[in-house]
Amino acid sequence: MLSLINHIKGEKIAYLAPAAEGNTWYPNRFIASRASNQPKLDSALATVKGLLDKVKEAGIPPEKTVIMGFSQGACLAVESAARYPQTYGGVVALSGGLIGAEGELTGYEGSLEGTPVFLGCSDIDFHIPVERVHETRDIMSGLGAKVDERIYPGMGHTINQDEMDAVNAIISNLLKS
């Protein structure tokens, strides 16, 4: 994610980018059962929650905070927002979706009222089934988020300029408010 900083436009932005031990946040696919990804999954979510708490304690309110990630980081971004709902400045998932096996995407409560959520993914991403992106869209919308889902034909597991433009739009709107 740090390599994307040069493509994000705006001043007075602080970035917190936690690094996963061994470059992986959890051992199995994000569509595997949550139990199969323990205890790493809970540890990863606690890391994100801890950072969100520190940012808030530093005087930066959630509505000025954007949670963003790519791949496993994208999954953690949307999962964290859904588990710890409040109005955020934005949530960005570049090639990711909510974590858990089919039937486990339940129990999300609270409100993301007005939070802009961007979900960008390829229709042929070998890590991310497009159906999970759609499920994530529906759940985040159900929590009150304003979801912008974009599915890119034939892109694969990468990030494109349109996605970066969407990220910059979220940040630009946030900096204006």
Task: Label the predicted regions.
Residues 1-5, 105, 129-139:
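Short alpha-helix in the alpha/beta-hydrolase fold that links the catalytic acid
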Residues 86-99:
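A conserved short beta-strand
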